[in-house]
Design a protein with these regions (language model features):
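Tandem repeat scaffolds
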Residues: 3-268, 273-277
Length: 278
């Protein structure tokens, strides 16, 4: 692996081997680090700043990224299954085709991330911010998405079946052909969203705000579901369904849980440290 240095950062230690040892600890700052294809299984990124890093196809199974900054980084086709990402900043990052199944990303910043075709089955993202994210074809079945910001997302053909999406903000999103079957949408805000071809079979919609939402082409909706939600004159529904008018202003509370304090790096011979050259 190459270990480039710059005026701002330098690698004090680096690996020449193809595989990076398990339980590696990485910290400090490294802008535009190249870690594509590396085996970083169980690695601990302890409050690190790895902005604009390239980790295409990297193995990060069970890695600890809590409190780190990976804004603008490329994780496409990477394996992050079971990774801990609480409170981390991934603004503008690319996770297209990546495996995030079972990952824990509560309170993470995922604004404008690309998750097209990603696997997030069973992932925990409570309190995360995915404003303007691209979720086209992503699998979020059985994921925990309570109090999450999903406003302005592009999520065509994504799978949210059996997901918990209570008290979340899905306003102005493109959810056409999405699978919401058996999902929990209680208290969620779907205002202004597009849901043509979306499947709501068995979804729970108690106190769901559908003002201005276009559900005219949605499938699996029943009057009993819609009767528990509320809307307005701009709400579009399938034929023969009616909705009661919302009273007052809908407020979605999305305060994320506090991120855990990153643990101290373990004592190990296999340590990568990135520090400022000052």
């Amino acid at each position: 692996m190459a270990c480039p240095a710059s005026a701002e950062t330098q690698l004090q230690f680096c690996y020449q081997d193809r595989d990076v040892a398990r339980m590696v600890s990485l910290g400090g700052t490294c802008n535009r680090c190249e870690l594509s294809g590396r085996d970083l299984t169980g690695a601990a990124f302890t409050g690190a700043v790895f902005t604009n890093a390239t980790l295409v196809g990297a193995n990060l199974r069970g890695a600890e990224l809590t409190g780190s900054n990976f804004a603008g980084s490329d994780f496409s086709r990477a394996d992050l299954s079971g990774a801990e990402m609480m409170g981390a900043d991934f603004t503008g990052a690319n996770f297209s085709g990546s495996d995030l199944s079972g990952a824990e990303a509560m309170g993470a910043t995922l604004v404008r991330v690309r998750l097209a075709g990603a696997d997030l089955t069973g992932a925990a993202l409570n309190g995360a911010n995915l404003n303007s994210a691209v979720l086209t074809g992503a699998d979020l079945s059985a994921a925990e998405l309570n109090a999450v910001t999903l406003a302005n997302v592009t999520a065509r053909s994504a799978d949210f079946s059996d997901a918990e999406i209570a008290m979340s903000d899905l306003s102005n999103g493109d959810f056409r052909s999405v699978d919401f079957s058996n999902a929990t949408l209680n208290g969620a805000r779907l205002t202004g969203g597009r849901f043509g071809g979306a499947d709501f079979e068995g979804a729970s919609m108690a106190r769901t705000d559908i003002r201005g939402a276009d559900l005219s082409g949605a499938e699996g909706l029943s009057q009993s579901q819609i009767s528990r939600a509320c809307g307005d004159a701009a709400t579009r529904l399938p034929a023969r369904l009616t909705v009661r008018v919302c009273r007052g202003v809908s407020v979605v509370r999305t305060t994320p849980p506090a991120a855990r304090t990153p643990p101290a790096p373990p004592r190990s011979r296999n340590t990568v440290v990135v520090s400022s050259d000052r």
